[in-house]
């Protein structure tokens, strides 16, 4: 692998700035030159064997020549694959959780015919049968007791119709649940380009999302919100999970041009 270097001025630390391989190589090259030179410049800058430049950067003294390692992992590119590997691992775990959730949905779908059959029997067939039997009994008593039996029949009918209404509402809720289960969610992975101007995170055809996961792998702070208020920060290396139905209503921007990664759980 070729060793790349950055300018000394880029070593000035900015808020939430990530140390790239070229920056690390530059820092270690300066250390190597300091050790080769020695003298007052070495003793005035090095403290306890460490490089220390006030308000800029602090690093252990060392020189890696051909390869750079951070936390035991090689840094090969400016994109820092350590963070990317971490994102892929997290996304894989979240995908497995969604797939497990879908398995639970499919099991619920298989049980729905039994639930609907039971609701129909309990709320309609059995109730109508009981109503017919009770109404027949009340009418037979009407010939004997007169007006009191008529009032009793009226009260019974009022109660029965109220029960029918509540049963119909319950059945409608069951059917609505069936409609949701027949449209299970899928997963879409997107790369979203951001600038310093707020813009929607999604501009495609109309979709309905259950939840969205955003991962910020850039060196910039990403802010998210709606069209007017979008000041909630996502720091470099952080992720955010939120639930929203229409992703086109979500706006985001960053302190510099960058790309963020998104995982959409979409209802088809």
Swiss-Prot record:
GO cellular component assignments: host cell membrane; membrane
UniProt entry tagged with the keyword Membrane: yes
Keywords, comma-separated and alphabetical: Host membrane, Membrane, Transmembrane, Transmembrane helix
Localization (cell): Host membrane
Residues passing through the membrane, by range: 150-172
Membrane topology: Single-pass membrane protein
Name by which UniProt lists this protein: Uncharacterized protein 268
Species whose genome carries this gene: Sulfolobus islandicus rod-shaped virus 1
């Amino acid at each position: 692998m070729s060793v790349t270097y950055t300018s000394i001025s880029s070593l000035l630390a900015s808020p939430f700035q990530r140390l790239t391989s070229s920056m690390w190589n530059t820092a270690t090259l300066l250390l190597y030159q300091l050790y080769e030179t020695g003298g007052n410049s070495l003793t005035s800058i090095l403290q306890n064997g460490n490089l220390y430049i006030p308000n800029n950067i602090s690093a252990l003294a060392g020189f890696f020549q051909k390869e750079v390692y951070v936390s035991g992992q090689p840094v090969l590119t400016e994109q820092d694959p350590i963070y990317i590997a971490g994102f892929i691992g997290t996304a894989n775990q979240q995908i497995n959780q969604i797939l497990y959730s879908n398995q639970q949905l499919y099991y619920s779908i298989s049980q729905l015919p039994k639930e609907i059959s039971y609701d129909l029997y309990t709320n309609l067939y059995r109730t109508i049968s009981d109503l017919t039997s009770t109404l027949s009994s009340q009418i037979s008593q009407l010939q004997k007791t007169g007006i009191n039996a008529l009032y009793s029949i009226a009260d019974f009918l009022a109660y029965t119709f109220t029960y029918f209404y509540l049963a119909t509402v319950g059945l409608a809720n069951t059917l609505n649940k069936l409609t949701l289960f027949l449209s299970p969610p899928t997963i879409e992975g997107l790369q979203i380009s951001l600038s310093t101007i707020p813009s929607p995170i999604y501009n495609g055809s109309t979709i309905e999302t259950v939840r969205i996961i955003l991962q910020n792998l850039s060196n910039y702070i990403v802010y998210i919100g709606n069209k007017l208020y979008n000041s909630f920060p996502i720091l470099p290396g952080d992720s955010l999970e939120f639930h929203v139905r229409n992703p086109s209503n979500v706006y985001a921007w960053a302190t510099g041009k960058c790309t963020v990664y998104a995982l959409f759980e979409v209802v088809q």
